[in-house]
A protein has these predicted regions:
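Short N-terminal signal/transit or membrane-insertion segments
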Residues: 7-11, 31-39, 92
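A solvent-exposed, acidic/Ser-Thr-rich amphipathic alpha-helical stretch
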Residues: 20-72
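A generic signature of intrinsically disordered, low-complexity regions enriched in glycine/proline
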Residues: 15-17, 41, 83, 102
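Short acidic-aromatic low-complexity motifs
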Residues: 1-26
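A beta-strand edge to alpha-helix "cap/lid" segment located at domain peripheries
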Residues: 2, 49-125
Length: 125
């Protein structure tokens, strides 16, 4: 995908997600979500959507610092607070998105989410 196509798709994805819409429409059928630090992998559009919703339910005071795009890839940098441990240090993270044929095909989340991930039960991993 060209950079402008990638940028538009990522903007549309976050727009729908921010409006609490059906953001899984942007996923390939066999999309994957991997929590690198915890070794958790979730596969499939519905399962990934459910996992992302559950993960966001454990996050508060979310700050997006930067979104960078290139041909067929995007990277989001941010930080948040674990709602279960509000006195803990902020969690810095980076999510890398792979895109092809106007769909998100894979997402990899880098950060120290170990404690938060243990509170989430993926629907299909």
């Amino acid at each position: 995908m060209r950079i402008d196509e990638t940028q538009k798709m990522i903007n549309d994805y976050f727009g729908v997600m921010g409006a609490h819409g059906e953001f899984s429409q942007f996923y390939a059928e066999d999309v994957t979500w991997i929590m690198i630090d915890a070794g958790v992998e979730t596969r499939g559009a519905a399962a990934v959507r459910d996992y992302v919703v559950a993960l966001h339910g454990q996050m508060s005071d979310v700050h997006t610092h930067r979104i960078a795009v290139s041909e067929g890839a995007a990277c989001l940098e941010g930080d948040c607070i674990n709602v279960q441990k509000t006195d803990a240090p902020r969690i810095a993270y980076c999510v890398v998105y792979d895109l092809a044929d106007n769909r998100i095909t894979a997402m990899r989340c880098y950060g120290t989410f170990g404690a938060m991930v243990s509170q989430i039960q993926p629907a299909d991993s």
